[in-house]
Structures are given as structure tokens and as C-alpha cells.
A protein has these predicted regions:
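Walker A/P-loop nucleotide-binding motif
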Residues: 41-63, 80
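Mid-core helix/loop region of P-loop NTP-binding domains shared across ATPases and GTPases
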Residues: 83-84, 99-142, 151-157, 193-198, ...
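Conserved AAA+ ATPase "SRH/arginine-finger" region at the nucleotide-binding site
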Residues: 77-81, 171-174, 185-198
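Short regulatory helix/loop adjacent to the ATP-binding pocket of P-loop NTPases
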Residues: 64-67, 167-183, 192
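A short, basic N-terminal segment
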Residues: 1-42, 273-275
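Conserved AAA+ ATPase "sensor/coupling" helix adjacent to the nucleotide-binding pocket
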Residues: 93-96, 165, 174, 193-212
């Protein structure tokens, strides 16, 4: 509705990750640098953590656009609570392998054969595991064991782990993950956006959908928006969606700070809080 009222080509603040809307904040720029370094090493584990809605999935979607898919094969896993055997099966399926499950040895053999074939064809292999905080210790250990596969002295698999802050804590302090910890070659925790990044972030997304100055945005909004959302991108998107909707319903050409305050108050008391 509001996108039609304001003449946008699409919704600028949708919650699903879209690399077309990628905004390089200070913390995301650092994360990309660590990812680039880690991928150039071609081995071990890269770990990216951050709060819910901090932009981990959008970062990875942006990264995938930059990867050379003729030289790098990527498998992706979004985890629920997997045990070790399930992790092996899901990893195999992420690479398109025809495995039936229930036979860990067969699944491992299929993965090893696949990795060797990719290497012989001049391709590296990356496994991306999202929501890593849901993995059991056993599943994480199985991922470490997969990193043992080699062709000569060259590792055949590299793994990117994405998780919430509790995964960062688990990895840092669990005695059972000492060996995995030693194989982490790059890590970064996504911080919230800084106050001065809120306006550029919002305008970046608006410009992407053809914003032409309508609606105008009161300059007092940015400080209040940062305070209300803590600089978390998903929270900003939620608030801005509701603010634009209010503006369209009331046929406003200017988004005022009192409108933002009304939206924040409403969201704090309904079933869709800023969280």
C-alpha cells in the first residue's frame, strides 16, 4: 500500500535478506574483510556472529554474489537442533548428494568422494552453516572432522559458521570445542550500526526503490530511530515500514518525529514489538 502511495518500485524495508539492498556499515565492511582473508586461506573455519537482525544473512547473500561460482562450490545449511549424524546427512544434501540418511559412513564416503572430485576439477568447496547456535557439540565436532579431508596437503573443505552471540560464547569457552577453536582462522562479531549510519542506511534503501523526495523525512527522526532500534538493521526496517504505512494512511508528504514516536509507542504495546 504505502509503496504505491509514495511511488516506490517495491517495498524498501522488507525483512527477507536481499543483497540488492546491501548497505556497507562500518561493522559489515570489517566482516567482509575478515571473510575475504579467510576465504583466501582456503581452509579451517570462519565465524561471523551477531544479534538477531544484525544483517548476517544479508552479508552472506552479498558475499555469494561476489564469489566465482566456477571456482568455488557452496553448500548451505540452516540448522535446527541437529546431532552429529544428522549434521553429516544435511551437509551431504547441501551439496546435492543423493544420500538417504541413516548410514553415517556412507554419507561421509559420499562427501569425501564429492570433495575430491571438486578439487580435481579445480574447484574449492565452502559449507555455510547458518544459525550455528542451534548445533549440538556433537554436530560441531562432526563439522571439524569434515575439515580433516585433504588432497595431499590441501584441505578440501572450508566452513563458514554464522550464529547469534551465544554461539560466540560457546565457541570461546567450551572445553569440548578446543580443537575446533584452534581451526578458526578469522572471526568477526557484527556490532549494531552507529548513530551516524542510520540516515545513510535508510536513504540507501529508499533510493534503491526510486524515492524522489516524497516523503520528506524530518531530520530529528534519525537520533530517535537509533535509540528505539539500537542500530539493529531488522528493527530499523520494522519501524520504517510502520512509519511509512502511517504516512500513507494519513496521506502525509512529510514523516515527522511525532509520527515516529506514535509508531514506536504502538509497536511497544502490540504483538509486533521492536525486538
Amino acid at each position: 500500500m504505502y509503496e504505491e502511495f509514495y511511488g516506490f518500485s517495491e517495498r524498501p524495508f522488507q525483512l527477507t535478506p536481499d543483497p540488492a539492498f546491501y548497505f556497507e556499515s562500518v561493522t559489515h565492511k570489517k566482516a567482509l574483510s575478515y571473510l575475504g582473508y579467510g576465504l583466501n586461506q582456503g581452509e579451517g573455519f570462519i565465524v561471523i556472529t551477531g544479534e538477531v537482525g544484525s544483517g548476517k544473512s544479508t552479508l552472506v547473500a552479498h558475499l555469494k554474489q561476489k564469489l566465482d561460482d566456477e571456482r568455488l562450490t557452496v553448500g548451505e545449511v540452516v540448522t535446527s537442533a541437529l546431532d552429529g549424524e544428522e549434521m553429516i546427512h544435511v551437509a551431504a544434501r547441501s551439496f546435492g548428494l543423493d544420500v538417504t540418511g541413516g548410514d553415517k559412513a556412507a554419507d561421509l564416503a559420499a562427501i569425501e568422494l564429492f570433495l575430491h572430485e571438486e578439487a580435481r576439477n579445480g574447484r574449492r568447496t565452502l559449507l555455510i552453516v547458518d544459525e550455528a547456535q542451534n548445533l549440538s557439540i556433537g554436530a560441531l565436532e562432526e563439522l571439524r572432522m569434515l575439515s580433516n579431508f585433504q588432497l595431499g596437503s590441501h584441505p578440501l573443505l572450508q566452513t563458514l559458521l554464522l550464529g547469534q552471540p551465544e554461539f560466540k560464547q560457546l565457541l570461546a569457552h567450551s572445553d569440548e570445542l578446543e580443537q575446533l577453536r584452534q581451526r578458526v582462522i578469522a572471526a568477526h562479531h557484527l556490532e549494531p550500526m552507529q548513530p551516524g549510519e542510520i540516515e545513510p542506511y535508510v536513504m540507501h534503501r529508499l533510493n534503491h526503490v526510486g524515492w524522489n523526495g516524497n516523503p520528506e523525512i524530518d531530520s530529528g527522526i534519525w537520533v530517535k530511530l537509533h535509540k528505539a532500534t539500537g542500530g539493529i538493521p531488522r528493527k530499523i526496517n520494522q519501524v520504517m515500514t510502520r512509519l511509512l504505512l502511517l504516512g500513507a494512511v494519513e496521506e502525509q508528504a512529510v514523516l515527522e518525529t511525532d509520527m515516529l514516536e506514535a509508531v514506536i509507542e504502538e509497536m511497544s504495546g502490540d504483538a509486533a514489538p521492536v525486538e
